[in-house]
Design a protein with these regions (language model features):
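Short, ordered, surface-exposed loop/turn motifs in non-cytosolic proteins
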Residues: 48-57
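Asparagine-centered strand-capping/turn motif at beta-strand->loop junctions
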Residues: 40-49
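Extracytoplasmic/periplasmic/luminal assembly and interaction segments
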Residues: 56-105
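N-terminal Lys/Arg-rich, disordered targeting/topogenic segments
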Residues: 1-12
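Short coil/turn motif common to extracellular beta-sandwich-like domains
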Residues: 33-39
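Hydrophobic membrane-insertion alpha-helices, especially the h-region
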Residues: 13-31
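Structured, soluble extracytoplasmic/luminal domains of envelope-associated proteins
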Residues: 84-135
Length: 136
């Protein structure tokens, strides 16, 4: 026959085991559902096709080469920040009609595991191929 004390101990062990299992599941869901990374959105609000853009880290490593964005269209990229070593930033580069390179800071400061969102709006392109860019 099981005494009352043994019954309470078994009941407490069962409750603790269920709570531990629940916590493990909750931690797993949060870890995989809210993974770190930056979402970069680039929207071409002009009437011209934009070509040859690059998203790069400040240290020079290319993240994504964008061959073109059609007029009134947008693209989104998810950048995994878990592989970043040390401090960094995300830069958008392009060239004007004369081949002169320009850089726009998309994310000013970044470290491993950071997350967030940055919206890049290309509102105009002048006759020289320079962009009027707004970043939010």
């Amino acid at each position: 026959m099981v005494s009352r004390r043994e019954f309470i101990i078994k009941k407490n062990k069962t409750i603790i085991s269920v709570l531990v299992a629940f916590l493990i599941v909750v931690i797993g869901v949060f870890k995989f559902s809210f993974s770190s990374g930056y979402k970069i959105s680039i929207e071409n609000k002009t009437d011209k096709t934009i070509a040859n853009l690059e998203l790069k880290y400040k240290n020079g490593n290319t993240i994504k080469t964008i061959s073109q964005i059609e007029p009134k269209k947008s693209l989104e990229y998810n950048i995994d920040t878990n592989s970043i070593q040390g401090e960094n930033a995300i830069i958008l580069t392009y060239k004007d009609n004369k081949g002169i390179s320009y850089e726009e800071s998309v994310v000013g400061y970044l470290e491993k595991g950071y997350s967030g969102k940055s919206n890049v709006f290309i509102n105009e392109i002048d006759n020289n191929g320079n962009f009027g860019i707004e970043i939010k």
